[in-house]
């Protein structure tokens, strides 16, 4: 039985890979980074580590997969958002380097690196073939292209076979809003949220449905040999944004406005898959005309998974916004409410033989500084100063209050005590968070060791049973 290690977070792409290889009687291992993800039923063993972790070498040594497939350009673990693009790029390259190095050292037969059309970001008028020089401009494109170069370098310098597969605009039916990362589901989401689509009729594109992509990958993986290092898998079904927008407008129940923003010369981004089709018998079975209506139908049935509470068609936006504002304003309202009894107590204690020496405003400031920290201590101090000045105006004029040095001493005392205690509270809170973070890190390392150990035992038992059941084993003799 052949085995494969699929590296990448679970999603429509990874799930299709798992289902396909399971049907073909492969043993499936997965490597993910998110502990919250649930292991699919067909996965033999799941590992949860960072791709650049030292544990990667151990798990590859334990599982000994025939093939390692790195989902790379389509791994949903990498968000590629503006604020995190550089960090994602560093993690991507270091993770891929660790995977390639570990696989090569441990004798993995075949490593598959999944790339995409993002490595070509210039404008083209002809179909793009595998030998054309890449032209990335964005951080994501440059990172994926760098991953291709790294993979091809290992193919040339090690005994391990490495294949680079560019999947052209792969799309699927998204499970939720976060999964709307391809061109088609992204346009469907925009139409659902805003009821408006901006299109460029001169921009040609081609997208590949995830099931067709997985079928092509399986054909390449099971082949005894491959003639080339780089392959394109594409649908070659050329469409424009306005064609997709009109189909969405036709199928979506809500009114959709299409805004034509056609500018510039005609351009197209179509990857030629002639090299792949010459070597492997792939048949593209799914068209965007059939899949986009399915995407729209799924989104309409599960709007709660795709729309935020304050967005159009949700219906409960105002109530949720008010609730969020109230939650944020609660500590401030609490300070105002508690100020009233302290203000009354302070006024009643003036001239009292028993309570005259108690500074109720100082107690009030200390209470909120200890409970909430520096921010609420500042508000409590301001309210205390207002209450103090208001009480002093009973017996003196405003001008006399302004020039009285005792007023400023009292104000300084309140603020110094409040800010000091509030600062200590915030510092203790940060120290507690750092301590918990360190405990979580050490616990995670311990869990990693435990998982690897349990996995090794499971694999050992599997092979022991296989040896005993063999017709040539000593146990059967």
For the regions a protein language model found, what residue spans apply to each?
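N-terminal Rossmann NAD(P)H-binding glycine-rich loop of SDR-like oxidoreductase domains
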Residues: 3-24
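NAD(P)H-binding glycine-rich loop region in Rossmannoid oxidoreductase-like domains
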Residues: 50-91
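NAD(P)-cofactor binding segment of oxidoreductase domains
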Residues: 67, 82-111
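Conserved Rossmann-fold NAD(P)-dependent oxidoreductase catalytic core, especially the SDR/UDP-sugar
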Residues: 97-139, 382
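Active-site Tyr-X1-5-Lys
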Residues: 135-163
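NAD(P)-dependent short-chain dehydrogenase/reductase
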Residues: 152-204
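C-terminal substrate-binding subdomain of Rossmann-fold SDR/epimerase-dehydratase oxidoreductases
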Residues: 199-307
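Hydrophobic transmembrane alpha-helices
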Residues: 334-351, 365-406
